[in-house]
Amino acid sequence: MEGFDDIIHQPLRLRIMAALHAARKFDPLEFARLKKLTGATDGNLGSHLNALEAAGYAAITKDFVGKRPRTRAAITTAGERAFRGHTDCLRDLINEARD
């Protein structure tokens, strides 16, 4: 099915991508904020962010603010295209099921 993306379709990854998509015009989302938005645990969020980064859908940056580590994530151009394609495909499936 064109547009359907197995990487994004996993429920937590879909929530992560939705949050990154919504924040795309602003600064990257900090790990703690993304964790709160998605309801993920530290380990789950880290693992799924790594999978999205490996697919080229998310860019992860790590730095320090003072002495505290900071991890942030942003959607990439490829991630934006994949997310839009996937959500368009889901929308079409839902509309077909309603008809």
Region locations from a protein language model:
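Basic, amphipathic "hinge/linker" alpha-helix immediately C-terminal to the N-terminal HTH DNA-binding motif
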Residues: V65-H86
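Canonical helix-turn-helix DNA-binding module
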Residues: A32-K62, K67-R68
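N-terminal helix-turn-helix DNA-binding core of bacterial DNA-binding proteins
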Residues: F4-T41, V65
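Amphipathic alpha-helical dimerization/coiled-coil segments
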Residues: M1-G3, H21-A22, A82-D99
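Histidine-centered active-site/metal-ligand motif
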Residues: H9, H48, H86
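Structural motif
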Residues: P11-L14, A55, R70
